[in-house]
Amino acid sequence: MLKKPISRLVFTFFAGSVLYASPFCMEQASAINNLMELFSKKTKPAPVYESPVDGNNQLKVQDPSQLKVQDPSLSEKSQNKAIKKPNIEQIKRATIASPKPFDYKPERLVPIKFPAIDLIETNSTVKSSTPFGLPLSARYNVILESDASKDEQATTEFRLADLSAVDAEAEQSIAGLVIHYYEQNPKLLWSQDGEVVTKAKDILLFFSHLDDDGLEPQDYLVKMPDENLFGEERQRALANFDVTLTSRILRYIQDASNGRIIANRLSPFHDLPRKEIDFGGELNRIAKSENTIAILKSYLPQSDYYLTLKKALAELPEARHNDNIKIAAQTVIKPGETNDNLPKFTALLLSRAPSGYLSEHKAILQNLNGEKNYNGQLVDAIKDYQKFVNKTADGIIGPSTIGTLVNNNVDVKRQKIINSMERLRWLPHDFGSRYVLINQAAYRAQYVENNEIRLDMKVVVGSPQRQTYFFYDRIRLVTFNPSWGVPNSIVVNEMLPRILQDSGYLQRNNYQLFDSSGKPVSASAVNWQKVASNGRGISIRQTPGKTNALGELKILFPNKHDIYLHDTPNKAAFSRDMRALSHGCVRLEYPREMAAAVLGKNVDDLKPYFAKGERSISLGQPVPVYLTYFTAWPDLKTGRINYYDDVYSRDALMAGATEKTDSVRQQNM
C-alpha cells in the first residue's frame, strides 16, 4: 500500500481507468456518501483515493467500494474512523408491497318490486320506469288497448296486480332482469289453471340435487304454494312462486356459468371476467323447451375434468371421526431410524391413503403396523406412496409427506373437490382442441391436444408473496435468446439495495440501464438517491446470455400482469417438492419441448433459433393458456384425484367467501 497520498496526475489516470472499467462506480460512491451525510455542508478539500498496488508498484484497477476515501482535513488517526462504509439501512427507500386479499363482498339482495298499477283510474297507465331505471315496455298498453273482452282485461288487470304484491328478493342484477322480463311478458310462467306446472316441479327436483355439483341446493329451491289457499290468495301465492322461481333460475344460470363466488372479489391475483349471458333469451328457451333439464345441465361445465371431479365427489365416503391420529408437525423419520411416531404414520396410511395405493400395499402396512424401526419393506412402501402422491420418493417421512394425509381427510378432500369444480366454472367451459394448462398448486404444466396430454412437466411458480395470477390468455409469441426487462417491483425491492452496496453488480450480471424515456444511460448519470426514495426513474434490462434469468427462451401471451413462461439457468429448483419460488412468472422444466409444442414443430427444428441473437417467432394460430389453481385435480388416464397443498391460501379465501355468500342468501330462504 502507498503510505502517502498519490499525486493528482496519477489519481487522474487511476480514476479514469476505474470509470472506464465500471462507469457506475465513482458516481455511486459519491451518491452514497451524500445519502449518509458523511460529509458536512461546509466546503472541504477534495478527497483523494488510496489504491492498492501490485508487486511492481503499478496501480490496480478495482471496485471503488474497496477504495479508501481520505479527507485531508482529518488527522491520520481519525481517517479510518471517518471512512466507514455507508449504512444502507439508513437510506430512505421506497418499496412496492405485494397485493393483499380483498374483504369479499357477496352481491347483496334487494326486493323485487314491481311498479304499482291502477287500471281503473288510468286505463293502462303505469310508471315510466322500474326502480332499477329499466324502461317499461309498451306491451301493457298494447294488451289493454286491444279488442280483448272485458274478461280478458280483468284477468290481465288481476295478474299485474298480483305481481305488484310480490314479496321476493334477489341479487340486484337479477332483480332488475326479472322485473324487465315480466314487463315484456305479463303472464305467469310456472302455473296454469291455478296449479304449478310439471316443468316447474322438474326444475325444482333438478335443483335439489345440485350438491352433486358442489353447489348449495337451498340457493335455488322455492317453497311450493300452500295447497290450502284459494281464490285471490291462491293466485297471489302462485304469482309470488312464479317470480321467485324465475329469479332462482336466473341465479342458477349465473352460478353454473360463472361460479357462485365472484372470483375477482377474492384478491388482486384473480383476473377472471364473468361470461356475458342473455338471461331473457335463456329464460324463454327454458320456458318453451320440451327438454328443460338438458338445458339446465348445459350451463355447467361438461369437460372430462369437471365430470371426473363430480364422480369423485359422489364416491367420497362419509367423514370418519374415529381416526383422530395426530403427528407432530415437524416430525422427520429417515430410513434406518427408530421413531415412536412411525406407527402413527402407518396407521394414517391405512386410514386415509387413496384406495389405489392401498390395493397394493395394505397387506404389508397391516403386517408392519406398530413397528417403530423404519427399514426394509416399510421404506419401499413409503417410497411408493410418495410416488403415488407426486412427492420426492426419498423414503423420508417429513412434513410434506405427512401433510398429504393429515391435511387430506375426507372433509378436506370434499372441500378441495368442490373448490376445484367452482374454479372450473370461472373458466371457459371449453378449453379448446389444444391448450397449455398450468396448475399452480400442483407445480405442473401440461400441453394438451385433442384431449390427449402430449407434455407434462414440473414448473416453478410465484412465491406466496409474489403469486402467479389466476387468469387465461392466448400464447402468441416465442422469443429465443431473450433479454429480460426487470419488473419494477424487483428493481425497487431487491436490486436497489444490491446496487447501492455493490457498485459492480449491474455490470457483472450483464444489466443495461435506461432512463424514464427509455434512453440508455450510464449508472454514473443516475440520481440513485432519488430513485431509491421514489422507486421510479429507471428501468433495467438484462442482456441475453447463459446467466440471463429467462434462460434461452420465453413463451409470451401479452397481458397486464407481465406473466409469461420461460426457461431458467437455475435447474435445481425443479428437484424440490415446494416450487412456489419465483416472482410470478412460470419457469418450465422442459422449455424447448413446450416451445416446440405451441409452435407445432419438432424440438430439433428449434436449433437454428438458438444460434445467435434475440429472435421472436409468432404462432400461426394462438394457443390458449390457462394459469389455474386447483388443489384437487384428476389424472384423466387413471381417474384418480390428486390433492395439493393450498400454498397461496386461496382455499381459505374461498371458505370465507362461501360463508359470507351463505349468510346473504339464507336471509331470503
Over which residues does each language-model region extend?
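Well-ordered beta-sheet/strand-loop patches within structured domains
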Residues: 2, 34, 38, 45, ...
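Bacterial N-terminal signal peptides that target proteins for export
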Residues: 2-13
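Bacterial N-terminal signal peptides
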Residues: 11-23
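Amphipathic alpha-helical segments that form the core helices of the histone-fold
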Residues: 200-203, 226-232, 236, 379-386
